[in-house]
C-alpha cells in the first residue's frame, strides 16, 4: 500500500497537470491559454461517499470502505449521478479524497477557514493570511484580480440578512482583510459590467465616478506634498489606493469590446429582489463564466450556500423553504429524507 505522503504527492501532481490542460481554457488574444480557477464553497459540504464512483468493486471497493489510499482511472468508471454533466471531461478530472480538515474545523460557520486552512471566526483578528484563491489571483493577475459571488443567508452569517447587497464573503485578501462578495446577480452585473452598460443612467454614473476618482487622486497627491512623516504616509496610502482603482478602470476600458461581447444575457427574473436560491446560483454562475471568458479575472469564488441559507426553488419541493442547517442535522423536507434533500441542493 502506498504511503499517505507519496499518494498525496502524486495526486497533487495529477491535479496540477489537469490545471495545465490547454483544452480546458479558451485562449486569450495572444493565443496563450490562461490558467483559470473556480472555487465553490458549500455550507454543508459534501459527504465523502457522494464522490465515490458507483462502479467501484472488488479490491478497490474494499479499500474505499476501509478508507485506504488507492488510485483508479476515472475512464474506467462512471461518475456519481449528480456529477453526470462532467462525464465527457473525465480525462481532465481528478477526485481527491481523504484530506484532513482538522486545521480549519470551527463548528457551524467556517468563515474564511476552508480556503485559508486556519480556524477563522467572526473576529477580523482570526484571519491569519490570504486565502488560497487570492494567492492564485496574485500568481495569475488580471484586471479585476478576483471576484467573489455568494448566496447569503437571510439571517445572521456574513451578510446579516442583506442577501442582495455586497457583504463580507468567505475569502481574504490578507491578514485581517476579509473580501467582499456580490450577493445577487443584479448588483454583480451593475458593478462588474457598468463600463459597457447600454443604460444611459449607468453610463452617466460611470463617468461621474471616473471624474470623482480623478479629482480625488489629484487632491490627495497635492496634499501629500505639503505633509511630512506619518501623516504624509497615510495620505500617500489613500492616494495609491485611488490610483490603483483608476488603473483597474483603465484596463477595463481597454477590454471594453471583449467584455461587451461576453457580457451575460440574463432574463428579467434574475434581477428580482425575491429571486429564489436556485435561480440566484444560476445567475451567479453565468456571471462567473462571463468574467472568466472575457478575461476580466482568472479566479472566481462562488458560495453556493451556507448553513443559514434558506433554499427555495428546489426541484420537486419548489413550494418548500428548505433550512439547510436542519437538513444537516437529518431533518426531512416533505416526502424526502435529509440525505435525499442534500442530493437536491
What are these regions (language model features)?
Residues 2-345:
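Ligand-binding pockets and gating/stacking loops
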Amino acid at each position: 500500500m502506498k504511503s499517505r505522503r507519496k499518494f498525496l504527492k502524486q495526486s497533487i501532481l495529477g491535479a496540477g497537470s489537469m490545471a495545465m490542460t490547454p483544452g480546458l481554457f479558451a485562449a486569450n488574444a495572444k493565443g496563450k491559454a490562461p490558467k483559470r480557477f473556480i472555487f465553490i464553497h458549500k455550507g454543508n459540504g459534501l459527504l465523502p461517499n457522494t464522490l465515490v464512483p458507483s462502479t467501484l468493486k472488488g479490491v478497490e471497493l474494499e479499500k474505499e470502505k476501509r478508507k485506504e489510499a488507492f488510485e483508479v482511472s476515472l475512464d474506467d468508471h462512471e461518475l456519481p449521478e449528480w456529477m453526470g454533466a462532467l462525464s465527457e471531461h473525465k480525462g481532465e478530472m481528478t477526485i481527491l479524497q481523504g484530506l484532513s480538515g482538522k486545521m480549519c474545523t470551527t463548528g457551524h460557520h467556517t468563515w474564511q477557514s476552508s480556503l485559508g486552512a486556519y480556524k477563522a471566526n467572526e473576529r477580523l483578528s482570526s484571519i491569519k493570511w490570504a486565502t488560497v484563491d487570492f494567492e492564485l489571483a496574485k500568481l495569475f493577475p488580471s484586471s479585476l484580480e478576483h471576484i467573489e459571488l455568494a448566496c447569503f443567508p437571510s439571517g445572521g452569517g456574513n451578510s446579516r440578512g442583506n442577501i442582495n447587497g455586497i457583504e463580507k464573503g468567505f475569502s481574504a485578501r490578507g491578514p485581517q482583510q476579509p473580501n467582499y462578495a456580490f450577493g445577487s446577480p443584479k448588483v454583480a452585473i451593475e458593478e462588474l459590467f457598468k463600463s459597457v452598460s447600454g443604460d444611459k443612467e449607468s453610463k452617466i454614473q460611470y463617468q461621474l465616478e471616473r471624474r470623482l476618482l480623478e479629482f480625488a487622486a489629484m487632491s490627495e497627491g497635492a496634499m501629500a506634498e505639503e505633509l511630512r512623516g506619518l501623516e504624509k504616509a497615510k495620505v500617500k496610502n489613500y492616494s495609491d489606493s485611488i490610483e490603483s482603482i483608476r488603473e483597474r478602470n483603465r484596463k477595463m476600458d481597454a477590454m471594453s469590446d471583449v467584455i461587451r461581447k461576453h457580457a451575460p444575457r440574463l432574463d428579467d427574473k434574475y434581477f428580482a429582489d425575491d429571486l429564489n436560491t436556485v435561480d440566484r446560483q444560476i445567475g451567479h454562475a453565468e456571471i462567473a463564466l462571463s468574467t472568466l471568458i472575457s478575461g476580466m479575472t482568472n479566479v472566481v469564488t462562488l458560495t453556493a450556500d451556507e448553513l443559514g441559507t434558506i433554499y427555495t426553488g428546489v426541484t420537486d419541493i419548489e413550494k418548500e423553504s428548505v433550512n439547510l442547517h436542519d437538513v444537516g442535522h437529518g431533518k426531512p423536507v416533505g416526502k424526502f429524507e435529509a440525505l435525499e434533500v442534500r442530493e437536491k441542493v
